[in-house]
Amino acid sequence: MMVPRISASPVFKRIFLRWGFVTLPIQKTVSHTLRRDFSAPCRSMVKCLLLRPGISVHSAQDRKFYSTEEKSSQFDENKSKSNNGKKNEPHGIKGLMAKYGYSALIVYILLTCVDLPLCFLGVHSLGEEKIKIYLNRGKQLIGMGEPDESKVIQDVRRKQAHREAVQAENADKVEDASRKTFNERWQEMKDSTLLAELLIAYGIHKSLIIVRVPLTAVLTPSFVKLLQRFGIDLMKKQKKVFQTMASGAKIRYKGNNPSDFIKNEGTALDITKRKPRTKGQKWFDGLM
């Protein structure tokens, strides 16, 4: 009866894959089993592998790991460079001005002139009573409002009745408006809700910038084409202005020190005499 021999190759593979190095007792036992099961060429090849403990499967895995790590680091560097390039590019209305010139600014100002009055009319159409109620609710958020809204409504109606009575009394009298003192005018402004309406309308107007900028991007190309039909090209004029400014600001160094420079002719701009930015210019940049 033939008894099948169990091959030692699975045992050898387990030992070889678990440890990258093989100790001397394991070498003897494995070589003893190989004498019985493997042929002479296979035994010589396996012995050569066993006598070189420095070679392991982990080395190939480490090479793959480090190669993938290098690729990921290169990808992260390229991604950071692209993100830095995107951050340096202007966005919003400044990006549109860099692309279309002053035409984008004109379209944006026209949309602003339409948007702000519409917001004010929408707020003013609510009426003094509703505006006072909304203002009282806003004050309640910071703990300064009246908890009972009925009192607010009664106060508004009482002031309206008093104002109508004063206007009816002064209807028969010819009174010069210039005789009113500053305190009287300020009291009238405080009693009216025009200032509150204007502030609310301006807040709504600023929140609608997410609508104005896309509308500017949509309408600016057609506006540029319309101007070009009439022979007006604001982009060329803007480039000429910047070219003249750049030619006037040219300098050349006469030494290794960057602060030591010579003006390029009498048309060059004197850097030391440049005026600082005014508050109006800073406000305009913040508004854009």
UniProtKB/Swiss-Prot annotation:
* Organism lineage string: Eukaryota, Fungi, Dikarya, Ascomycota, Saccharomycotina
Annotated compartments: Cytoplasm
General function of this protein? Maybe involved in N-terminal acetylation of proteins. N-acetylation plays a role in normal eukaryotic translation and processing, protect against proteolytic degradation and protein turnover.
Q: Which InterPro entries match?
A: FAM210A/B-like, FAM210A/B-like_dom
- Where is the stretch described as Disordered? 68-90
What does the UniProt keyword field contain? Acyltransferase, Cytoplasm, Transferase
What GO terms are given for molecular function? Answer: acyltransferase activity
Name the encoding gene, please.
Answer: NAT2
Q: Name one GO cellular component term.
A: mitochondrion
**Quaternary organization:** Heterooligomeric.
Chief location of this protein? cytoplasm
Other observations noted: Present with 1240 molecules/cell in log phase SD medium.
The protein here is known as Putative N-terminal acetyltransferase 2
Q: What is its EC number?
A: 2.3.1.-
